[in-house]
A protein has these predicted regions:
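Terminal accessory carbohydrate-recognition/targeting modules of carbohydrate-active enzymes
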Residues: 1-254, 503-596, 686, 710-720, ...
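Short secondary-structure capping/junction motifs at helix and strand boundaries
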Residues: 127-132, 321-322, 368-378, 389-400
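Secretory-pathway/luminal and periplasmic proteins that interact with or process carbohydrate-rich
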Residues: 143, 334-338, 387-396, 473-484, ...
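The feature captures the catalytic groove of carbohydrate-active enzymes
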Residues: 190-219, 292-296, 335, 339-356, ...
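Extended, well-ordered alpha-helical scaffold segments
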Residues: 213-228, 248-255, 317-330, 371-389, ...
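Substrate-binding groove/exosite segments of carbohydrate-active enzymes
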Residues: 233-376, 433, 599-614, 620, ...
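Gly/Pro-rich turn-and-neighbor structural signature
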Residues: 242-260, 268-272, 466-491, 508-517
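Non-catalytic carbohydrate-binding regions of carbohydrate-active enzymes
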Residues: 455-497, 520-522, 528-599, 603-606, ...
Length: 791
């Protein structure tokens, strides 16, 4: 494994959590820690947690004393901390608190309720050294007591209580209680010239002090070197090492894999295989109800788009992607329905999963070549695909289904369908046909066709090929040459009209409109109240439809509310509007009436490119006039979620860069041979990632397209560096049996070396060199499309 040398100004993210590959993390009671080298309070080499918000804070840090001087802050060290190794549950750092004295600090989480550390102190001078160590602990409880210096079974420890936990800190070597300003355990460390000394500490937090003490003492007695070797072996077997011409990129890709692995929990009776959470931070991991049903959305189930992205981040762990597919399919019902958010506590999203599961399964198969897996999942995936064409989802029966809820789209904040913000349109998504859904179904269909061909399932092939042709035609009908974009269209009229404001008023009453339309329109009525009090809102629309006079009543139970905002979409489309009556409002409530706007542009409308639908001419126009337009989508830090910014409050949504969507868009660029553009997109995204890893020591859920600053949750899955897209753009795919597929050539500005399980490939601008685990090398001229085998 690579030996790093990362300082505080380099890309870093130092969260620690129990690793599901090496232990059994507790989904309901999981303690997550983060190392803050110098930026915490006090400024120290500070480990901190909140035990999932059961304490205001718990902090552990060392203090060093020599020749009457005491240092705590890394900025005061003779040599600042340098990160040498990092894994999901392990960190090691080197530093020198004083000149000539080096410390190797290791941190390890062996299980969810404990953390351990080991300090190796080395005297590199030619004189004896007298140094003192204090291990300090600061607990700010919510309910309970701060850490106190106590004895348990004649051992000096620090113990406290917060909520239902009784944390205990234990230090080997027979420490005394420290005299300093913080609760601490202290040891004298006399060292001869060239000598070293090693000691370990542990913290455990169970329900009672005695149980915590016993767990801490047992953990301190574990064989550190053997445990570290095991950690390194497991990670070496599943991690891809990347060496580019930019060490910041290398670190970002390595931290992305570390973080991605840390998001997994083992399967249980609710989900049969390991599943993931969206982020794993010190404030997470505690279920007050004790069953996980109260967890927020970040911990409430695996979602399909994030599962697809996560699989691309872990090219060395294809079996995990197989397990994610099986988890989704474990929720399947007789009609083919598969839930969109199955969770480890039995959570369900209650909506049909978006059609990316066959794509995920095919991606997993390409990594593992496990044909038995394909044979197992093909029938249920086919049933799932067909479920999308049931009348409940294809309401007009035209073969182009509609989304049921914005959650399914992977872009829940889409302003076209977002109810939560007054500035968003908020139309009922079930009244809209989206080229993104049609394209996803087409791509799903193509994946099923590939499976059927591999498995020799000729009976299903004909039906799938017919579906694929129909979906492609319908998606292309959404193409708008003038804007060089695909557009949404109305479910019933199949038209993509621009929206128009019709009227405004305050409070209940009638609006006389007297408007006629050549092309039928659908109405959108938005209400903004002055307070959060419930309104018995009802709306009556009178006008003409294609079937004659119509009086449509929208009852209060059909109105969608969020805080002070409500949005109502008419069920009918109208050729003439006569009168709209609004009832149940207060006098100062604002009512706005408009026709639905189908011309709003967002990142989901690039999915036809990902699916490989447009012909070359349309694809070139979509890429060059749409995607790469700097006045619409293309920004210094990536492709923005929306083409325009309706108002300043919309900035964090419309100008956000979301990595799963960069992945899909980048894959679309590669499909049409735009390798240089894909490399540039990766570079822009990486600039945002690295900026935040350096300044904030964290990934973020999204990034600002113009400024690069992080948006949303820290260290979220959706903000990890796009390793999968990078490898695809580089043209490197590792296969079982030390085999390697190379395609194209290196479009990046420097040579790139990628290593996996002893296999190494270096891609330069015009040639590649492959080194097998036995040392044999093969040189190839690029561009190439070659399967490289060890024999």
């Amino acid at each position: 494994m690579r030996d790093w040398y990362l300082g505080l100004d380099d890309p870093l993210t130092l969260t620690l959590a129990a690793d599901f590959r090496l232990s059994q993390p507790d989904y309901l009671n999981d303690h997550i820690w983060e190392l803050e080298p110098g930026s915490g309070d006090p400024p120290a080499l500070l480990l901190h947690t909140t035990y999932g918000l059961r304490a205001r804070s718990m902090r552990i840090f060392p203090r060093f004393t020599a020749s009457g001087a005491t240092v705590t802050a890394p900025a005061s060290f003779a040599a600042p901390p340098r990160l040498r190794r990092f894994y999901p549950n392990f960190l090691s750092l080197n530093f020198s608190p004083f000149t000539g004295v080096e410390v190797l600090a290791e941190y390890w989480i062996p299980a969810s309720q404990t953390i351990a550390g080991r300090l190796t102190v080395m005297n590199h001078t030619n004189q004896p050294s007298e140094m003192g160590l204090e291990l300090c602990g600061l607990l700010v409880p919510i309910e309970g007591q701060s850490l106190a210096q106590v004895q348990i079974q004649s051992a000096n420890v620090l113990a406290g209580r917060t909520s239902d936990l009784a944390p205990v800190i234990f230090l080997t070597g027979g420490p005394l209680h420290g005299p300093g300003p913080y609760p601490s355990l202290t040891l004298d460390l006399p060292l001869e010239a060239g000598a070293s000394r090693q000691l370990a500490w542990t913290q455990a937090a169970l329900g009672e002090p005695q149980a915590s003490f016993e767990l801490a003492r047992r953990t301190a007695a574990r064989a550190w070197d053997a445990e570290r070797a095991r950690i390194e072996l497991v990670n070496a077997a599943q991690t891809v090492e990347v060496q580019t011409g930019d060490p910041d990129w290398d670190a970002a890709f390595a931290f992305s894999q570390k973080t991605a692995f840390s998001l997994f929990f083992p399967g249980n009776e609710r989900l049969p295989n390991p599943s993931f959470v969206m982020a794993r931070q010190p404030d997470h991991g505690h279920s007050m109800r004790g069953d996980g049903s109260d967890y927020p959305s970040l911990w409430s189930g695996q979602s399909p788009l994030e599962a697809y992205y996560l699989a691309s981040l872990l090219p060395g762990a294809g079996e995990l992607a197989e397990g994610l597919v099986r988890n989704f399919l474990s929720t399947q019902e007789k009609d083919g329905f598969v839930d969109c958010r199955p969770g480890l506590a039995g959570q369900r999203g209650r909506w049909l999963s978006p059609p990316v599961l066959a794509c995920l399964a095919w991606q997993a198969y390409q990594a593992t070549e496990n044909e038995a897996f394909l044979a197992e999942v093909f029938p249920p995936l086919l049933a799932f695909f067909q479920a999308w064409f049931a009348p409940a989802h294809d309401r007009d029966g035209d073969g182009v289904p509609e989304w049921d809820h914005p959650l399914q789209t992977g872009f829940e904040d889409n302003p076209a369908f977002n109810l939560w913000h007054a500035w968003a349109q908020g139309v009922d998504i079930a009244t809209v046909e989206s080229p993104a859904l049609a394209a996803s179904l087409y791509r799903e269909c193509r994946s099923l066709i590939q499976m059927a061909e591999k498995l020799g399932r000729s009976e299903e092939l004909e039906m799938l090929q017919f579906r694929a042709v129909a979906l492609r035609i319908e998606t292309e009908e959404c193409w708008n040459a003038g804007s060089a974009m695909y557009h949404y269209r109305d479910r019933d009229t199949h038209r993509s009209l621009a929206g128009k404001a019709l009227a405004k008023r305050r409070g209940s009453g009638k609006l006389k409109l007297k408007r006629s339309y050549t092309a039928p329109v659908r109405l959108l009525i938005r209400v903004q109240t002055k307070d959060k009090a419930f309104r018995r809102l009802e709306v009556t629309i009178k006008g003409q439809t294609s079937s004659g006079a119509q009086a449509e009543l929208i009852k209060r139970q059909d109105v969608q509310w969020h805080m002070e905002n409500a949005a109502l979409t008419s069920r009918e489309v109208y050729t003439q509007l006569n009168e709209i009556e609004v009832a149940g409002l207060e006098p100062n409530d604002q009512v706005t009436i408009s026709t639905v706007d189908y011309t709003q542009e967002d990142q989901t409308l690039f999915l036809p490119l990902w699916a490989g639908i447009p012909e070359e001419r349309h694809a070139a126009s979509l890429i060059e006039r749409g995607l790469l337009d700097t006045d619409r989508f293309y920004h210094p830090f990536g492709v923005s979620a929306c083409a325009s910014l309706p108002c300043p409050p919309a900035e964090t949504i419309c100008l956000s860069v979301q990595m799963p969507w960069q992945q899909l868009i980048g894959e679309g660029l590669l499909t049409y041979g735009y390798y240089s553009e894909a490399a540039q997109l990766i570079a822009r995204s990486m600039n945002a990632v690295i900026l935040n890893l350096k300044q904030q020591h964290a990934f973020y859920r999204a990034y600002h397209a113009e400024r690069g600053v992080g948006i949303g949750e820290r260290n979220a899955l959706a903000g990890l560096a796009p390793l999968g897209l990078f490898l695809q753009t580089l043209g490197v795919q590792f296969l079982p049996g030390s085999r390697l597929r190379l395609s194209g050539k290196n479009p990046f500005p420097w040579p790139v070396t990628v290593k996996y399980r002893g296999l190494s490939v270096t891609r330069r601008s015009d040639q590649s060199e492959v080194t097998f685990p036995d040392g044999r090398t093969v040189a190839l001229s690029d561009p190439s499309d070659t399967l490289v085998c060890p024999e």
